[in-house]
UniProtKB/Swiss-Prot annotation:
Organism: Agrobacterium fabrum (strain C58 / ATCC 33970) (Agrobacterium tumefaciens (strain C58))
Function per UniProt: Catalyzes the base-exchange of a guanine (G) residue with the queuine precursor 7-aminomethyl-7-deazaguanine (PreQ1) at position 34 (anticodon wobble position) in tRNAs with GU(N) anticodons (tRNA-Asp, -Asn, -His and -Tyr). Catalysis occurs through a double-displacement mechanism. The nucleophile active site attacks the C1' of nucleotide 34 to detach the guanine base from the RNA, forming a covalent enzyme-RNA intermediate. The proton acceptor active site deprotonates the incoming PreQ1, allowing a nucleophilic attack on the C1' of the ribose to form the product.
Alphabetical GO biological process terms: queuosine biosynthetic process; tRNA wobble guanine modification; tRNA-guanine transglycosylation
Keywords, alphabetical: Glycosyltransferase, Queuosine biosynthesis, Transferase, tRNA processing
Protein name: Queuine tRNA-ribosyltransferase
C-alpha cells in the first residue's frame, strides 16, 4: 500500500505521457478515464462492472451529494467509499460547475456563492472552505478547488474577473485542505479562450505547489480547435512532474488529441449519457443504434471486444430495446461505451510504453473515419 500521494512519469511518446498516480486506496494508470458517478452511482452500471472494465478511479459530484444524501450523513455512514462499495480512489469535483449551471438565483462574491437547490429550492452557501469541508466529509482521495467556470463565448472582462477570483479561491482551498497524507488537492486553470489569462492562471496555481493541476472551463461551448489551442498554451506552463487533468472531456477524439498534448486524466458523462440515448462509440466511430438499418442486424457492436454487451448482444436486440425505451437498452449501451473508453485508454497507454503513440493515433483516427460496418 502507498502511504503518500505520488505521481511517477514513466515514459513519453511525442507529447503523450505514460504515468502512475499512487495513493493509499490504489494506483491510477495514466492516461486515465474516470467514469462519472455523479450521485454515488455510475448511471446504469454496477460498480463491480466499472472496475472490471479497467477503471482505477471514479468521480463523485460535491454539489449533488451535498444536496442529497448530504455530506454529514455520508460521513456518519463511513464515507463515500463505504456507502457505495467502491474501495478504490475517488475524485470529487468542487461543485462549482453545477452551482453555476444548475442552481437558481445565484449570488456570487468573494466569500463564495449562495444558491437555491435545483432539487427543492432550499438556500445554500458554498465557500472555498465549505467545499473542501464537504469533500473531506465525503472522504474522497483527490479533491478539487472551488472555482468559477464561465460558459463560452463570454466577454474578456468577465473571463478575467472569474479567473482572478478562482486563483484567490485556490489559495483559500489550499489552506483549508492543509496537509493530508495520501490525499491531494488539485487547482483548476481558468481563463476561458484568452491565452494570456490561461498563462496567468497556470502560473498563479504553480506558485501554490499543489499535488496536481486541472484545466477547467473548456468543452463549455467552444469549438474543439479552441480547446486544443488553450491546451497548447497552458500545458507548457504547468510542472511536468505533476498530473494534469482535463475536466469534463470528452469524446474519444477529444481524449486522443488531448493525450497527444500531455493530458493525464479525463472524466465525462458522455459514455453513459450517450448510451442511455442509443448512441454507441466504437472503434469504427459512432453508431446510432436507434436507426432502422440495425433493426434486423444480428451482428454485435464489436465482436473483438471483451465486453459482453459489445460482443454478445445483437444490434437488432439493442435497436429493439432502445426503440422500446427499455432500461436494459441503456444499461447495455452504457456498459459497451465504458468498455470502449477503457479499451481506448489501454491502447493509448500501451502505445506510449512501446514508443509508437503517433502510429496508434493515426491508426485510430483512420478507423473512425471508415465509419460503421456496411448494413446487412
Amino acid at each position: 500500500m502507498h502511504e503518500k500521494f505520488t505521481f511517477t512519469l514513466k515514459s513519453t511518446s511525442g507529447g503523450a505521457r505514460l504515468g502512475e498516480v499512487a495513493m493509499p486506496r490504489g494506483v491510477i494508470r495514466t492516461p486515465a478515464f474516470m467514469p462519472v458517478g455523479t450521485v454515488g452511482t455510475v448511471k446504469a452500471m454496477y460498480l463491480d462492472q466499472v472496475r472490471e472494465l479497467g477503471a482505477d478511479i471514479i468521480l463523485g459530484n460535491t454539489y449533488h451529494l451535498m444536496l442529497r444524501p448530504g455530506p454529514e450523513r455520508v460521513a456518519r455512514l463511513g464515507g463515500l467509499h463505504e456507502l457505495i462499495r467502491w474501495p478504490h480512489p475517488i475524485l470529487t469535483d468542487s461543485g462549482g460547475f453545477q452551482v453555476m449551471s444548475l442552481s437558481g438565483l445565484r449570488k456570487l462574491d468573494e466569500k463564495g456563492v449562495t444558491f437555491k437547490s435545483h432539487v427543492d429550492g432550499s438556500l445554500h452557501h458554498m465557500s472555498p472552505e465549505r467545499s473542501i469541508e464537504i469533500q473531506g466529509m465525503l472522504d474522497s482521495d483527490i479533491q478539487m478547488q472551488l472555482d468559477e467556470c464561465i460558459a463560452l463565448p463570454a466577454e474578456r472582462k468577465e473571463i478575467e474577473r472569474a479567473m482572478e477570483m478562482s486563483l484567490r479561491w485556490a489559495e483559500r482551498c489550499r489552506v483549508a485542505f492543509g496537509e493530508q497524507p495520501g490525499k491531494a488537492m488539485f487547482g483548476i486553470v481558468q481563463g476561458g479562450d484568452q491565452p494570456d489569462l490561461r498563462i496567468r492562471s497556470a502560473e498563479g496555481l504553480k506558485e501554490l505547489d499543489l499535488k496536481g493541476y486541472a484545466v477547467g472551463g473548456l468543452a463549455v461551448g467552444e469549438p474543439q480547435d479552441v480547446m486544443l489551442g488553450m491546451l497548447d498554451i497552458t500545458l507548457p506552463v504547468l510542472p511536468t512532474e505533476k498530473p494534469r487533468y482535463l475536466m469534463g472531456v470528452g469524446t474519444p477524439d477529444d481524449i486522443l488529441k488531448s493525450v497527444a498534448r500531455g493530458i493525464d486524466m479525463f472524466d465525462c458523462v458522455m459514455p453513459t449519457r450517450s448510451g442511455r440515448h442509443g448512441l454507441a462509440f466504437t472503434r469504427r466511430g459512432r453508431v446510432n443504434i436507434r436507426n432502422a438499418r440495425h433493426a434486423e442486424d444480428m451482428r454485435p457492436l464489436d465482436e473483438q471486444s471483451n465486453c459482453p454487451a459489445s460482443r454478445d448482444y445483437s444490434r437488432a436486440y439493442l435497436h429493439h430495446l432502445t426503440r422500446s425505451n427499455e432500461a436494459l437498452g441503456g444499461m447495455l449501451l452504457s456498459w459497451h461505451n465504458l468498455a470502449y473508453y477503457q479499451e481506448l485508454m489501454q491502447g493509448i497507454r500501451t502505445s506510449i510504453e512501446e514508443g509508437r503513440f503517433a502510429d496508434f493515433y493515426a491508426e485510430t483516427i483512420e478507423m473512425w473515419a471508415r465509419g460503421d460496418i456496411d448494413p446487412v
